[in-house]
């Protein structure tokens, strides 16, 4: 069977090597419009605290764990000169997370559950879509350690797609800009909270660095939530969640190392702040992140066959994460 014709949305202004390049302008637009006063605040930070305008965009066809004289890995950072930097491979990774997790939750979790509740098939499950999302997720996770080019012909991507693929591609694009925006706001907060000044002035110990990171998370969350307008609320919430949960696949441990709080602690801190209802899909997506993490590293978590809601499942999983930490 012939595949539907794919059309490229690449324009001459899209610089870079990977398909994620087509969302460069979306990233900047969302960042500048984080909330009604953000652009004014960022200009004040440039004038008064030395934030460097613009964002450095590194283009290296290398894995996320690649390092050189400019950075220790291809994850976002703000440097000693207060310039925020992002990397093309990391952006690709985050888009993959946004697409795969939304498709897998919608097609492999939510729709089957609705069918069971209705006692009949009210939703047709697209198994091909699930399969392609799983393949894409496998590719995305591989980028942590090994770089290979994105197979635009066979894997979903934001640059070349058919009209049949538009629904989930566009949804992923929206989630992606929110996820990256949370990460950019986190780096922005490090400048605003004078963390960079402190680190450049004096030795800052591990515990204080973790306090800095929590403060940056909290400020980034605050900035993002101030941008809610009734239409983008769910996208903002899910974007922040994906930005945090995507860190799970780097290690079988949720440890944040010497500088960051543990990943599970950061996720719970965010969910506590937005306090979703028990049946909010965000609990199911958070649980799905942990289920795939469990499968990836063979952690042997126990997954109950009957639950009241996804919030219960999430906290059941979280307890197993905490128990694992106590034993290690």
List PLM regions with ranges:
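Serine/threonine-rich low-complexity intrinsically disordered regions
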Residues: 52, 59-61, 126, 157, ...
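Generic structural motif recognizing short loop/turn segments at the entrances and edges of beta-strands
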Residues: 51-71, 80-82, 206, 236-244, ...
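Long, well-structured alpha-helical subdomains associated
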Residues: 225-328
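Peri-catalytic and regulatory segments of divalent metal-dependent proteins
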Residues: 4-181, 188, 193-197
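Divalent metal-coordination and catalytic microenvironments
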Residues: 86, 216, 262
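Short helix/loop segments within enzyme catalytic domains
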Residues: 25-44, 180, 196, 200-258
């Amino acid at each position: 069977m012939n595949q539907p014709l794919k059309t490229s949305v690449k324009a001459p202004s899209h610089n870079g090597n990977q398909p994620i390049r087509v969302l460069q302008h979306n990233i900047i637009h969302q960042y500048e419009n984080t909330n009604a006063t953000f652009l004014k605040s960022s200009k004040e930070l440039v004038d008064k605290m030395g934030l460097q305008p613009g964002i450095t965009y590194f283009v290296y066809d290398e894995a996320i764990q690649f390092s050189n004289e400019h950075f220790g890995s291809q994850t976002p950072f703000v440097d000693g000169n207060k310039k925020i930097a992002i990397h093309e491979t990391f952006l690709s990774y985050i888009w993959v997370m946004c697409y795969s997790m939304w498709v897998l939750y919608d097609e492999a979790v939510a729709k089957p559950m609705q069918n069971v509740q209705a006692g009949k098939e009210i939703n047709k499950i697209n198994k091909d879509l699930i399969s392609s999302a799983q393949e894409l997720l496998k590719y995305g996770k591989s980028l942590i350690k090994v770089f290979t080019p994105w197979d635009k012909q066979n894997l979903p991507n934001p640059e070349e797609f058919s009209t049949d693929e538009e629904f989930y591609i566009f949804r992923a694009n929206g989630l992606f800009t929110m996820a990256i925006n949370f990460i950019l706001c986190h780096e922005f907060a490090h400048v605003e909270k004078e963390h960079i000044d402190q680190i450049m002035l004096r030795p800052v110990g591990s515990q204080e660095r973790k306090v800095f990171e929590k403060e940056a998370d909290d400020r980034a969350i605050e900035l993002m939530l101030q941008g809610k307008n009734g239409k983008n609320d769910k996208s903002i919430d899910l974007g922040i969640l994906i930005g945090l949960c995507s860190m799970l696949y780097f290690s079988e441990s949720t440890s944040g190392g010497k500088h960051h709080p543990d990943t599970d602690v950061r996720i719970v801190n965010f969910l506590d702040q937005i306090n979703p209802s028990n049946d909010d899909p965000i609990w199911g997506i958070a649980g799905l992140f942990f289920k795939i993490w469990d499968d990836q590293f063979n952690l042997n978590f126990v997954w109950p066959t009957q639950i009241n809601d996804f919030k219960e499942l999430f906290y059941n999983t979280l307890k197993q994460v905490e128990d694992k930490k106590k034993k290690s």
